[in-house]
Amino acid sequence: MLKRIFIMLAVALAFTIPSQAISIQELKSSPQFKVIYEVTPDGPNADEHTIWYLDTKSIEVLEYASPMYKIKATVYNAYQSPRKNVIYSDSWIVSYDTRLSLASQVYRAKQAGASLTTVIDAAQTKTGMTGTEEPLGKFSFDGQLLPVQVNASTRAIVRTAPNTTRYDIADTLFYEAYRMHFEDVVVK
């Protein structure tokens, strides 16, 4: 009985351990980590800098049943400012419906004789991508584990500002898994 309790405790502990510590040097120097998106704002916050990295070895296809796809990967967000230098590690799970890719929507609009304005309006509201971000860890730039106080979130991924970062990350995951951009897939 006691052995069973220890085994269950070990299994529970294994699933609550945060992701492996990582430093900014490792993100910058290892070919395993690909820069997805980079932001240096203009104006009053020009001293801030954020870079998102994809751990290319973490990419896992969870669902492949055309037109539906689901991909999981680890994404690191390195944020640097005069006040703080921190790396956030998140597990991303993105669901894709290629019937709503831009190419699919344009194809169907052409078949129906719809106007370009109609296609643009539909494409802005129906992206075909939904993402879940689950925090794995938070680290200083030298790799020290920091406390995390964020819950997982699931939301639609849109093509327009201000959420282009999430869109670019989701498109990069699709590209890394299938060597084509999500928007280029046509479902007739």
Where do the language-model regions lie?
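N-terminal secretory-pathway/extracellular module detecting exported/lumenal segments
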Residues: A21-D90, D97-K188
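Homeobox/homeodomain signature
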Residues: I5, I17-P18, S23
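Sec-dependent signal peptide recognition
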Residues: L2-M8
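Bacterial N-terminal signal peptides
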Residues: M8-T16
